[in-house]
Amino acid sequence: VTSSLLDGYRLLHDGALALAEVERAGIRIDVEYCREKVAWLDDQARRSDRRLRSSALGRAWLARFEGSASWASGPQLQAVLYVDLGVKPYKTTEAGMDSVDEEALRQAGVDGIDHLLRLRSLKKMGDVLKQFLRYQVGGYLYPNYHLHTVTTYRSSSSDPNLQNVPVRDKEQMDVCRRAIVPSPGNVILEVDKSGIEVCVAACYHRDPAMLSYLRDPGADMHADAAKRLFFLDASVRDLKRLAGFSTVLRQAGKNGFIFPQFYGDYYEPCAQNVACGWCKLPRVGDWTDDDGLPLDGVPIARHLRQHDVRGLVDFTEHVRRVEDWLWQERFPVYYKWRQDWYARYQRRGSFQMKTGFVCGGVMSRNQATNYPVQGPAFHLLLRTLTLVVDRIRDFKSRVVGQIHDSLLFDADPDEVPALVDMVQRIAAEELPRLWDWIIVPLRVEAKVSEVDGSWAEMVVVE
């Protein structure tokens, strides 16, 4: 049963009050570390700037734009790279422009690209830490959390934006998250709603195959996708023993294929991302037996060539067939729901989320099918937050942050088991009672730092 708009209002009202307590609690940072690291990052940025200026890319850039040259300008980079230097674009943006994101730049093969990417990375890390220093008061940050700024009715953060701390790049994550530390004698505890958007989507489309995956803890749709993508016949259990499967091929199946497909991408960019991004295979020309990352010591190209996949063109056609398998054979009910949902949106111009909120206006196909999932996925976390904040008033621990699909605690080490158990119980028992449209198990994953450690070094709570 879909909630009413009044139910949605009450959720945001209670959530705003709970987030106010999270803001008031504050999150501790290592101020001295931030200052030292900012100085180091600025020095490294100056060095990268000098190297970029002396490279082929930098010289062409300065020749075209002279005093107005800006390394941060995307349009300038497009002109230099794709017009002056004649590089063939690797991919385009949704607006049809030649892309200059990291993935596209790494395929360009131009002297100076590494220095530009390094400069970008250094700037991103520096900007995060400088924001920390700007907004800290007595060694604590008190970021604002908003519930009224995002179209999908998710939260946002500002002053500083704690939800913008890097996580995908290992160095960026380590440098920035190392600044977040617990109160003396405490630990940082992060509890994450695992795969929450996939679970919420399943509550809409009710595809039997997807429900089976989500209800069976031993099932692994990402490993199954990797088996299809890479012509692997062994059982998932045996494959996970092979070096490179879980760390590369399964992740390629998950983040390079399954999730992009669920969010509306199609086979061609997926093939490029899986092959060239995850597996480090060449974009141009035939692959050799020595190309790509190894699977159990054997280069992946050697394995693919045994299945008549000799280059990116062949692999792209193979991924097209895997895409057909995904939607026509594996998840046909999910596919039909996407078509029907978008058609209904086109007729009405709006739709109502499971949690009661209404979205309307001009939307792309991807927006119209993703928004009803993204909003309720966050609302499950928000309801969890309100319950936890209310129940730990007599605890020494405090919720100090809400990051995407997770809650961040400044926790007393002795209270960690109780906190994890509380969130697990809310997810597994209380939320399904509150919202009877939840028809799949909701799981959580918890990670914890050492006592007086940092957010950068976390271990899984068993």
Residue ranges and their predicted role:
Residues 1-172, 181-187, 194-197, 267, ...:
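Conserved "right-hand" nucleotidyltransferase catalytic core of DNA-directed polymerases
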Residues 77-85, 194-209, 229-230, 413-416:
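Short active-site loop/helix that positions an aromatic residue
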Residues 158-165, 175-183, 188-200, 204-205, ...:
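Core catalytic machinery and nucleic-acid-binding channels of phosphodiester-processing enzymes
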Residues 36-71, 75, 319, 324-334, ...:
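Polymerase palm active-site segment centered on the conserved acidic dipeptide of motif C
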Residues 197-232, 281-291, 356-358:
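Metal-dependent catalytic core segments for phosphate chemistry
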Residues 24, 142, 148-150, 231-402, ...:
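Conserved catalytic core of nucleic-acid polymerases
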Residues 153, 192, 226, 270, ...:
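Hydrophobic, well-ordered secondary-structure elements that form the walls
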Residues 191, 213-217, 373:
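Conserved, non-catalytic sequence blocks in retroelement Pol enzymes and Pol-derived host proteins
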